[in-house]
């Protein structure tokens, strides 16, 4: 079999790439070494959709983090996957840690994260009454949320497959070689290699 693109790995990242490429008139294979999708790194995902204040300003990670977080509610709605926009707190237990919160807030604002605010002791205990009495402040990021990484990956792969992507399980790629025609060939533990341009 021959494909224009082969995506190695059916975790959340591979699934998203497959879904995006399924919008084009190309033949796409999504290959996964495990018996199903989301069985590698994705299974250990914390489910947190981070607001974007951690990444260093000006980096690709910072830009994609903020753009991805903004896109997540709409993506989840389209794929019928629950997204919970619960926000997040980074809690400080000393004045020195409050300085770190201020640095994170400034970094987040430079990255374009909307709505960041530092809450004082009274405000955080009003919002989170079970929080330790030792907490003195918190950075609140309203755009953070949670989504089940399994549900998101499964829905994304299903959408890609409905749009023409072919999904192969138990497909452990052991090498990538160029064949006589100049195409790349995936060598794997099953018979008959898959060619890709």
Q: What are these model-predicted stretches?
A:
Residues 5-29:
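N-terminal Rossmann-like FAD-binding beta1-loop-alpha1 element of flavoenzymes
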Residues 23-41:
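Glycine-rich FAD pyrophosphate-binding loop
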Residues 26, 113, 165:
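Short phosphate-binding/catalytic loops that engage adenosine nucleotides
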Residues 47-127, 136:
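Dinucleotide-binding Rossmann-like beta1-alpha1 core, especially the glycine-rich loop
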Residues 82-92, 125-163:
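Helix-loop-beta segment of a Rossmann-like dinucleotide-binding subdomain
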Residues 96, 131-135, 178-185:
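A short, glycine/Asx- and small/polar-enriched loop/turn
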Residues 143-184, 190:
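Helical element adjacent to the flavin cofactor pocket in flavoenzyme catalytic cores
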Residues 188-197:
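Single conserved hydrophobic/aromatic residue that forms the stacking wall/gate
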